[in-house]
A protein has these predicted regions:
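Gram-negative bacterial Sec-dependent N-terminal signal peptides
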Residues: 1-21
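Alpha/beta-hydrolase superfamily serine-hydrolase fold, recognizing
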Residues: 25-343
Length: 343
């Protein structure tokens, strides 16, 4: 097996677990789209836990998996930019649509990957789809990954970029008064937390938040975790591994900036409109939907949609880009961005 293919195999291994699952074998589960089943069959060939495998750096594992599928990266131009704000220096990537009508707003994107395996390289296709579909300028936060730093570093870096964008958007040709924030998986966690933080700190104003298959609680103990926590790309054990590094102190996990689901109704009041996307066969499904309900109970305008037949991070995975559920979710997200950011 050559090096590239080896890393593709490790990508599947990185997200497997030995926990028993209540759901049927994903290879035969009729609730899963056939294209998704084929993807799972390929990555499930190696069942070794990610953290026991050698790798030059964790991000290379997901990047190798993503690189296996050719994708369309046309219609955008991307530049790297390092910003300094609030005493923090953060690398970002600025992605501009080639076709722009008027002055665009900003889509601040916070990536997933359990704070370990994500980066711009393996998330750029998703950001490209959101930028082209919405017509807004994307700003990708390349926060410090685990284990180099833990909470609140990654969130504070994201807030620093949000603040910089609101004050310096003219430098990238955007309107800093129109900002949406989006994130997938733990990026969805930090999108929710950043919305709370911006409210608590009286700005910058966020006009729209998009939580894609978000992690909203550190407990790792919902019904969907136990039902779908093995064999479906993201595992319960891998999430627990990430949480133990990100927020090792149990007391810290009660902080709404760590577990947004534990925020009080009062704390959630006044948050920006939200789109919460979940997947039927995803360990994070229950907590994402519970957070959407809690937002609604707090009077927040929220659209919550579960996409059946698919798995965690389906919007991110290049191999699933042309599956109807992925296309529909991205179309829904970009429509929401346009609705809330386009004057």
């Amino acid at each position: 097996m050559n090096k590239t293919l080896k890393f593709v195999a490790l990508a599947g291994a990185s997200l497997m677990t030995s926990f028993a699952a209540a759901a049927p074998n994903p290879a035969t589960d009729a609730r899963i789209d056939p294209h998704v089943r084929a993807f799972l069959a390929e990555i499930n060939k190696d069942s070794s836990p990610f953290w026991e495998l050698p790798q030059p750096k964790p991000q290379d594992i997901l990047t190798a998996l993503q690189s296996k599928t050719p994708v369309d990266m046309s219609g955008v131009t991307t530049t790297e930019k390092t910003i300094t704000e609030n005493g923090r220096t953060v690398k970002t990537y600025i992605m501009k649509p080639e076709k722009v009508s008027g002055k665009p707003g900003v889509l601040l994107f916070i990536h997933g990957g359990v704070w370990l395996v994500g980066n711009f390289q393996n998330h750029q296709r998703l950001l490209r789809d959101l930028v082209v579909g919405s017509g807004q300028i994307g700003v990708f936060v390349e926060y410090t990954p685990l284990p180099a730093a833990k909470f609140p570093t990654q969130l504070e870096e994201s807030y620093a970029v949000l603040k910089w964008v609101s004050e310096h958007a003219e430098e990238i040709g955007a309107d800093g008064g129109r900002i949406a924030v989006a994130g997938n998986s733990v990026g969805g966690n930090m999108t929710a937390a950043l919305s709370l933080m911006a409210k608590d700190r009286n700005g910058p104003k966020i006009g729209y938040q998009i939580l894609m298959i978000p992690a909203t609680d550190a407990s790792v103990d919902t019904k969907s975790y136990h039902e779908y926590g093995t064999g479906r790309f993201l595992s319960r054990s891998f999430m627990k591994y990430g949480w133990d590094l990100y927020a090792p102190d149990e007391a810290t996990r009660n902080n709404p900036y760590v577990s947004p689901l534990r925020a009080s109704t009062e704390q959630l009041k006044g948050l920006p409109p939200a789109l919460v996307i979940t997947a039927e066969n995803c360990p994070l499904r229950d907590e994402g939907e519970a957070y959407a309900r809690k937002l609604k109970d707090a009077g927040v305008q929220v659209d919550a949609v579960r996409y059946n037949g698919t798995i965690h991070d389906f919007v991110l995975l290049n191999a699933l880009r042309n599956v109807p559920s992925t296309q529909a979710a991205i179309a829904q997200a970009t429509a929401g961005i346009r609705e809330h950011l386009v004057p």
